[in-house]
Amino acid sequence: MSDRQQVTNAKGERIAIVAGLRTPFAKQATAFHGVSALDMGKMVVNELLVRSELDPKLIEQLVYGQVVQMPAAPNIAREIVLGTGMNVSTDAYSVTRACATSFQSTVNVAESIMTGNIDIGIAGGADSSSVLPIGVSKKLAHALVDLNKARSFGQKLQIFRRLGLKDLLPVPPAVAEYSTGLSMGQTAEQMAKTYNISRADQDALAHRSHTLASETWASGHLRDEVMVAHIPPYKQFIDRDNNIRENSVLESYAKLRPAFDKQHGTVTAANSTPLTDGASAIILMSEGRAKALGYQPIGYIKSYAFSAINVWQDMLMGPSYATPLALKRAGMELEDLTLIEMHEAFAAQTLANMQMFASKKFAEEKLGRNRAIGEIDMSKFNVLGGSLAYGHPFAATGTRLITQVCRELKRRGGGTGLTTACAAGGLGVAMIVEVE
């Protein structure tokens, strides 16, 4: 059996990435304060259809995701279909794979095209850290169910008497892993200690990311892939990411205190991604249908792979496990790539993965390979800046990476690009795209 992955339909046609778009990414409780993930999702999908001059009725499937779920609208994909002029019969369902969510939605639509079930689909993801499902304590939740069953005033009074004042306090969404109780920041601290990653190196990577992102915005390269978002009641708008440190100064990063290990830590707010609001989406088609409709695809999916590792120690190593699988399935080596886009959840996580890419020992002991994945050429790595600067709306990052690397490869005359990300739960993803 061949190790090569056939990312084509029965006619041998490739899976075309026709267009991609995202909202600006905004820090929590800033520009998108009060705007739900669903509203941002509808906003970006509608604008993507308008810019692409694609009849919404031609969309056969929409797969969309969010990580922080909205109890009022758990199937965000279906609500986007109903809110953007598509046929009510359009197939739509929602997915979640933590920070790899919109990679998952992309793969799902691609596989629907590969099987011949559809020719045109939309994938993406959105998340809001400003509109959150605020919960209640377990005791209050239990009491509320009992109240619904109580018949007399006396029974209801007895139920209320079981509650203390602290039971009435709201409960925000958990930021820790369900299985381990560790937050992502605590895991990043683990990785910094395991791989001896210094505070200086973390700050330097963050400074690089912000500097490159600022230069990228100044160049105008992002104007065609980031929409202007008008915020209800439509008296203001946001037209660029608001987390980027303009005129970043490396020395200023050292002033921040550790965020997760107050005494001995090296992970700070400045070398981590902030809680972020935003949405993104891409249009996928079979190669034949794209050409028949007159589109020039921005790229094609060459291979993809998902991975999962232990959640207790250094669980954000997903890129180091998923990347060699995607490379093998594409029949490539790391040095064959034109560009590499790695999600920067934390500088520590990014540097740990970069270190393990170059480690023969890691390859032998963890991957069963006789050679390292490869040394990363920094002239190819996150050349436009990364998530540390742009921000990270969990479900939206994957399709941001895909669109961004495809468009940059187009500007460079084509080539192949790796997009890869870690995700909560010890998950990882890698996708290789090719651009003509």
UniProtKB/Swiss-Prot annotation:
Pathway: Lipid metabolism; fatty acid beta-oxidation. One of its GO terms (molecular function) is acetyl-CoA C-acyltransferase activity. It is an enzyme of class 2 (transferase). Gene3D superfamilies: 3.40.47.10. The active site is at C99, H392, C422. PROSITE patterns: THIOLASE_2 (PS00737), THIOLASE_3 (PS00099). Its main location: cytoplasm. GO terms for biological process: fatty acid beta-oxidation. It comes from the Bacteria. It is found in: Cytoplasm. Its EC number is 2.3.1.16. The keyword Transferase applies. GO terms for cellular component: cytosol. Keywords: Acyltransferase, Cytoplasm, Fatty acid metabolism, Lipid degradation, Lipid metabolism, Transferase. NCBIfam families: AcCoA-C-Actrans, FadI, PRK08963.1. Belongs to the thiolase-like superfamily. Thiolase family. This is 3-ketoacyl-CoA thiolase. It comes from Shewanella putrefaciens (strain CN-32 / ATCC BAA-453). The gene is fadI.
